């Protein structure tokens, strides 16, 4: 799932939509049931074709590449994003936090970095953007545990599950070991709070009109974390 930011100032709304459309379509391919791996791979190939200067009738990709060039996105960010989406097509568990962090960098942190470029925010806020993207994505994982089980995916590190005596995140395991399950979820929420605090350190670098939008989104996810 992708983090959404409400109340975007109108002057950059079009560009945010172009960014969001590109990300959402890639995400939809890998999250559909059954998963459309072939559709995703074609989408990825088309992106690299357009990036190399070829024309395409895929407006979403064409608009995104133009935006990327206009706002000077680092192409490595898009590589990382597509790599993480591809991980979703072939990976259903993560051994440890390092492995998960690779996924989170491409699926969430780089989106924050692209948003900073679109909002023309000082690079001092890059660290904040990465951690905010990561924190929001992580709360999505916690909120969507049930949904991800249907997709046969567990994003939480196997090492962490083991340390709470859980053999996996299954409905059966949650029913059999409710205390351990609850303690595990609490521990993951603490990790979210840590990343969220790190993100908030850079809010001061975001222009005031943008800060309201980012803070609203951040607060929505914070509220979700407290409700879980």
Sequence positions of predicted segments:
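Catalytic cores of Mg2+-dependent Asp-rich isoprenoid enzymes
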Residues: 1-136, 142, 146-228
């Amino acid at each position: 799932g992708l983090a959404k930011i409400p109340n975007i100032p109108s002057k950059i709304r079009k560009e945010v939509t172009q960014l969001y459309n590109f990300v959402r379509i890639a995400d939809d391919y890998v999250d559909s049931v059954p998963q459309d791996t072939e559709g995703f791979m074609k989408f990825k190939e088309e992106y690299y074709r357009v990036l190399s200067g070829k024309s395409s009738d895929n407006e979403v990709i064409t608009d995104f590449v133009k935006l990327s060039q206009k706002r000077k996105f680092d192409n490595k960010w898009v590589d990382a994003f597509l790599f993480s989406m591809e991980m979703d097509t072939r990976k259903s568990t993560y051994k440890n936090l390092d492995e998960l962090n690779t996924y989170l960098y491409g699926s969430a942190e780089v989106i924050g970095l692209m948003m900073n470029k679109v909002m023309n925010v000082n690079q001092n806020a890059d660290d904040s953007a990465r951690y905010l993207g990561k924190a929001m994505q992580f709360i999505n994982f916690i909120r969507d545990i049930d949904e991800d089980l249907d997709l046969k995916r567990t994003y939480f590190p196997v090492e962490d599950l083991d340390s709470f005596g859980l053999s996996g995140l299954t409905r059966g395991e949650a029913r059999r070991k409710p205390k351990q399950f609850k303690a595990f979820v609490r521990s993951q929420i603490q990790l979210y709070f840590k990343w969220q605090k790190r993100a908030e350190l850079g809010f001061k670098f975001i222009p005031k009109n943008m800060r309201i939008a980012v803070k609203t989104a951040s607060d929505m996810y914070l509220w979700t974390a407290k409700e879980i």
